[in-house]
């Protein structure tokens, strides 16, 4: 058994990282791809490793040096016209080597679990491609397989169709060819293909032709959760650095992303409470049906969107400002309109204190294991603290502490007497037992408490965190008017606006997102 590694490409999409290095010299968590690969091959009983080099080939050979000589016999083949050719030509240059032994064919821009080599080598089939069920991050050649794991056809990138993704498997770009297969099938077709269609093609195109033969014995070996990633650009590199990091570092790397976890299909996110039952199928279908129009059209400005937000919650347009998520509005209110001391209950949603200077914060930490507190606890603690603003997240994030609506109104009256403003963040109120009846978003309540402000994320109970919607409401119309001037003219996108628009339809509006 031998290994052939294709490493001639320029890796242009990696930008500065490959300006003076080959793609396989790029590091993931401090280890280069080529070092990781060669170290993995050291555990395999190989007669030799053949590396086809091209771009910065001398630099790669110098980098590898003699560090692996005691465990691997490494040979090099140079592709001098790597700029005008693709990997089919690199493999064609190695065809004489290919027919001399059984072969592991590997692309050099991969990172993968150590177990993959033993998996493919232990498989009894002589000609095998490692494949993985299609996921959204995958790009490149796909295959269809039958119930006996035969590869029935290769699907090149240009023939990819999203309506077929349920049947696609992605090639991992690790193959096992028997010597007999190389001599009698692959190399003859490789020679014919390059002669007919040229050298600027992919070696998988030859396999696509081969699988059309009646007696082609080429199997797929499907991964079962083993990790791997193909690194073509800096985003791939970033994702791979998360997937292949140690446990402690992995948590830190996930945490600093704040979202975008669709890039990690196996990850379950328990950090954010989001309603999985809303929007309704009808709403999603309507959003899909209007996708092209929304993608190509500008959203409305604040006038229309505050009208929609007011209709959404049944309050006056002049009492509400719509944000690109509550986070946009938190930043504005905390940085631009708060200069004195602020009462904050800990632990809390960090976005609020992060927008303040440390000397502004007067923290209250409940002295019990549940971090529970009441309105009376807050009034007692802050009675002599001379705060200008009290922040209450209700239900609390992250403790879950909940103060009833009647007690919040009592707290609001106390704040009024203390000449203290009150912000109530009720982003999670719909998850409480009585749901929306606990909300403070009503004209009557806001008008009776002009010193009180209500913040609400339209992500959690409405199941649309990706749309980035949030509102800030108060009967202090001067404050609302100033905040509307603070946000960009188009601070939400067309999809978010359309969601607000169709939510007002009776058949949808009557569907309670949490309790029905």
Residue ranges of model-derived segments:
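PLP-dependent aminotransferase class I/II
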Residues: 171, 301, 451-516
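Active-site pre-lysine segment of PLP-dependent enzymes
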Residues: 119-123, 373-384, 398-461
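Conserved beta-loop-beta/alpha segment of the NTase-like Rossmann-fold superfamily
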Residues: 71-141
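PLP-dependent aminotransferase-like
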Residues: 335-392
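N-terminal glycine-rich phosphate-binding loop and ensuing alpha1 helix
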Residues: 1-58
């Amino acid at each position: 058994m031998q290994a052939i590694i294709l490493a001639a490409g320029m890796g242009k999409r990696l930008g500065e990282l490959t300006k003076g290095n080959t793609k396989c010299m790029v590091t993931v968590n401090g280890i280069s791809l080529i070092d990781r690969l060669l170290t993995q091959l050291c555990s395999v009983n190989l007669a030799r490793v053949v590396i086809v080099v091209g771009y910065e080939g001398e630099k790669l050979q110098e980098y590898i040096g003699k560090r692996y000589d005691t465990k691997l016999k490494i040979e090099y083949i140079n592709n001098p016209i790597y700029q005008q050719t693709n990997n089919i030509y690199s493999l064609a240059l190695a065809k004489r080597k290919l027919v001399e032994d059984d072969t592991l064919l590997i692309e050099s821009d991969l990172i993968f679990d150590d177990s993959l080599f033993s998996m493919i080598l232990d498989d009894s089939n002589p000609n095998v491609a490692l494949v993985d069920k299609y996921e959204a991050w995958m790009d490149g050649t796909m295959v269809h397989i039958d119930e006996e794991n035969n590869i029935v056809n290769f699907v090149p990138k240009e023939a990819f169709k999203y309506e077929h993704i349920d049947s696609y498997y992605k090639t991992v770009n690790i193959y096992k060819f028997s010597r007999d297969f190389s001599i009698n099938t692959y190399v003859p077709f490789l020679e014919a293909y390059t002669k007919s269609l040229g050298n600027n093609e992919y070696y998988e195109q030859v396999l696509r032709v081969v699988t059309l033969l009646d007696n082609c014995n080429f199997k797929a070996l499907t991964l079962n959760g083993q990790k791997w990633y193909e690194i073509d650009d800096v985003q791939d590199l970033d994702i791979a650095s998360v997937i292949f990091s140690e446990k402690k570092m992995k948590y830190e790397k996930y945490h600093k992303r704040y979202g975008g976890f669709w890039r990690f299909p196996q990850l379950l996110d328990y950090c954010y409470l989001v309603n999985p039952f809303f929007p309704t199928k009808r709403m999603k279908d309507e959003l899909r049906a209007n996708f092209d129009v929304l993608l190509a059209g500008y959203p409305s400005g604040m006038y229309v969107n505050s009208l929609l937000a007011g209709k959404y919650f049944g309050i006056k347009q002049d009492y509400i400002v719509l944000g690109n998520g509550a986070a946009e509005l938190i930043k504005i209110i905390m940085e631009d309109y708060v200069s004195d001391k602020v009462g904050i209950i800990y632990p809390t949603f960090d976005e609020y204190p992060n927008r303040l200077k440390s000397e502004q914060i007067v923290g209250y930490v409940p002295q019990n294991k549940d971090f529970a507190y009441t309105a009376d606890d807050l009034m007692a603690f802050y009675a002599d603290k001379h705060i200008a603003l009290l922040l209450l997240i209700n239900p609390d994030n992250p403790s879950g502490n909940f103060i009833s609506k009647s007690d919040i109104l009592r707290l609001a009256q106390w704040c009024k007497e203390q000449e203290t403003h009150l912000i109530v963040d009720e982003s999670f109120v719909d998850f409480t037992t009585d749901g929306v009846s606990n909300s403070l978003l009503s004209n009557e309540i806001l008008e009776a408490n002009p010193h009180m402000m209500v913040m609400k994320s339209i992500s959690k109970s409405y199941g649309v965190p990706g749309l980035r919607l949030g509102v800030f409401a108060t009967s202090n119309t001067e404050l609302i008017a100033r905040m509307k001037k603070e946000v960009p003219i188009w601070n939400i996108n067309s999809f978010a606006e359309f969601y607000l628009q169709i939510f007002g339809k009776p058949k949808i509006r009557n569907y309670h997102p949490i309790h029905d």
